[in-house]
Amino acid sequence: AGQVLMTLGLKGQSGNGRDTFRKPSAVLVAPNGDIFVADGHDATGNNRIVKFAADGSYLTEWGGTGSANGQFRDPHALAMDSAGRLFVGDRANSRIQIFDQSGKHLATWTQFGRPSGLYIDRNDVLYATDSESNTGRNPGWRRGVYIGSAKTGWVSAFIPDPEPDQDNSGT
């Protein structure tokens, strides 16, 4: 059996404080050990990114509910590129927002669909999974995997979802 090394948040309590979350959906550990938490799985979540030091001590947070740069509606996925930029899959806003590690907004990309998952490989190839686009939720987009450059945002390939009923929403 494994051993719990660290716990963030308070067991059995939800909230929007430094030591509470409301529906966290993703965690990323940076190369230096800092920990980023995407807190806000749906409309009732906190819609924020919370940053902790490697020892679990609170450092900062940013976000809030909305569609302006730096705000979120369901921050659902996190990834980091070789330059240390933090990519946030802002799913309900159908975009990826990019930040420095202090929370400064650097860019917003809307060409990767409605991102549910993000992965950036060592060559800065970005893989963004869209499991929710369909006629009702995100017209004009298709569920699948968007593949592109984490440096430029250029989408170079798309792998469609093999499910034949594109109007049946995923998770």
Regions found by a protein language model. Name each.
Residues 1-171:
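Eukaryotic scaffold repeat domains enriched in small/polar residues
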